[in-house]
């Protein structure tokens, strides 16, 4: 991906540093916001490929699978929602992250790569005089060649083209506007679908609450009641090792069908950098070691 030390300037406003997972807002006195690891990796991939639609599968592969995790679609939806809050972006009129229905996501703002090295600019300035010399030599070549071409063209006598009698136009029996209207409607229909169709957001239901932290799961997700004791132990262990003001606002549980469960700890916007994804396995007598 990007070189170490490289930063990105988004829409001439946010300075994104993927190495420290930070986002500085120039309109707020360079106020620095810490991103979670998931949100930072999503923004890095979008910034590397601006204006390109990234599929949900590509984002899953880079953010989770390369780290050894397998999560469902709700984890990506939640991470995109948190990232938009950090960018102060709107879902209805986005200026940064745009949802492309049935395809994925797209970074639509301007992106400028800020390299830590300034030698590139000096090398460009040195090369400019050479390009001026090349232009001058090219003009000289054109000046020499053009007269010879003109002389050659004068010497060649083109044969006269035979005169073809014009045919009277045949009156069309079909109204010429009908094909144009059909073509216009065919072009207009997909545009209307893209503009007026909003992707459905994931819906969640609560399956429990431990240490004042609600546990959520997607509405259509299979039952995972047999995992509740392990979830309770994990949350109690997590709360014990974290300060009260940085506790998660909710935990999203997914999986459970392959003897493993994924827990997404979601924090508020002030502590979003602590968002983390954990995986626990069935058959563990004491799962608390990985739930710190």
Curated annotation (Swiss-Prot):
<feature type="topological domain" description="Cytoplasmic">
    <location>
        <begin position="1"/>
        <end position="180"/>
    </location>
</feature>
<dbReference type="GO" id="GO:0000160">
    <property type="term" value="P:phosphorelay signal transduction system"/>
</dbReference>
<dbReference type="InterPro" id="IPR036388">
    <property type="entry name" value="WH-like_DNA-bd_sf"/>
</dbReference>
<feature type="transmembrane region" description="Helical">
    <location>
        <begin position="181"/>
        <end position="197"/>
    </location>
</feature>
<dbReference type="InterPro" id="IPR016032">
    <property type="entry name" value="Sig_transdc_resp-reg_C-effctor"/>
</dbReference>
<dbReference type="Pfam" id="PF00486">
    <property type="entry name" value="Trans_reg_C"/>
</dbReference>
<comment type="function">
    <text>In the presence of ToxS, promotes the expression of the thermostable direct hemolysin 2. May be a global regulator.</text>
</comment>
<protein>
    <recommendedName>
        <fullName>Cholera toxin homolog transcriptional activator</fullName>
    </recommendedName>
</protein>
<keyword id="KW-0902">Two-component regulatory system</keyword>
<keyword id="KW-1133">Transmembrane helix</keyword>
<keyword id="KW-1003">Cell membrane</keyword>
<feature type="region of interest" description="Disordered">
    <location>
        <begin position="119"/>
        <end position="140"/>
    </location>
</feature>
<keyword id="KW-0812">Transmembrane</keyword>
<dbReference type="InterPro" id="IPR001867">
    <property type="entry name" value="OmpR/PhoB-type_DNA-bd"/>
</dbReference>
<keyword id="KW-0472">Membrane</keyword>
<dbReference type="GO" id="GO:0003677">
    <property type="term" value="F:DNA binding"/>
</dbReference>
<dbReference type="GO" id="GO:0006355">
    <property type="term" value="P:regulation of DNA-templated transcription"/>
</dbReference>
<keyword id="KW-0238">DNA-binding</keyword>
<feature type="DNA-binding region" description="OmpR/PhoB-type">
    <location>
        <begin position="6"/>
        <end position="109"/>
    </location>
</feature>
<keyword id="KW-0010">Activator</keyword>
<feature type="topological domain" description="Periplasmic">
    <location>
        <begin position="198"/>
        <end position="292"/>
    </location>
</feature>
<keyword id="KW-0804">Transcription</keyword>
<keyword id="KW-0805">Transcription regulation</keyword>
<dbReference type="GO" id="GO:0005886">
    <property type="term" value="C:plasma membrane"/>
</dbReference>
């Amino acid at each position: 991906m990007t070189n170490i030390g490289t930063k990105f300037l988004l829409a001439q406003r946010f300075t994104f540093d993927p190495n420290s997972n930070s986002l500085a807002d120039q309109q707020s006195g360079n106020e620095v916001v810490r991103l979670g690891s998931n949100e930072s990796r999503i923004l890095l991939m979008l910034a590397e490929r601006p204006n390109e639609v990234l599929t949900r599968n590509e984002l899953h592969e880079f953010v989770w699978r390369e780290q050894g995790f397998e999560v469902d679609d709700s984890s990506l939806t939640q991470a995109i929602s948190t990232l938009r809050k950090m960018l102060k972006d709107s879902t209805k009129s986005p200026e940064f992250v745009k949802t492309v229905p049935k395809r994925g996501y797209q970074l639509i703002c301007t992106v400028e790569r800020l390299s830590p090295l300034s030698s590139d600019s000096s090398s460009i300035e040195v090369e400019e005089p050479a390009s001026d010399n090349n232009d001058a030599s090219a003009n000289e070549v054109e000046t020499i060649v053009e007269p010879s071409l003109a002389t050659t063209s004068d010497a060649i006598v083109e044969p006269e083209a035979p005169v073809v009698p014009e045919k009277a136009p045949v009156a069309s029996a079909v109204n010429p506007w009908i094909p144009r209207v059909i073509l216009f409607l065919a072009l207009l229909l997909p545009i209307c679908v893209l503009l007026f169709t909003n992707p459905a957001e994931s819906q969640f239901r609560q399956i429990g609450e431990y240490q004042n932290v609600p546990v959520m799961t997607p509405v259509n997700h299979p039952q995972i009641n047999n995992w509740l004791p392990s979830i309770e132990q994990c949350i109690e262990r997590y709360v014990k090792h974290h300060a009260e003001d940085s506790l998660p606002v909710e935990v999203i549980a997914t999986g459970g069908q392959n003897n493993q469960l994924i827990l997404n700890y979601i924090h508020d916007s002030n502590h979003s950098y602590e968002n983390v994804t954990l995986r626990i396995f069935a058959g563990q007598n004491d799962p608390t070691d990985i739930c710190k």
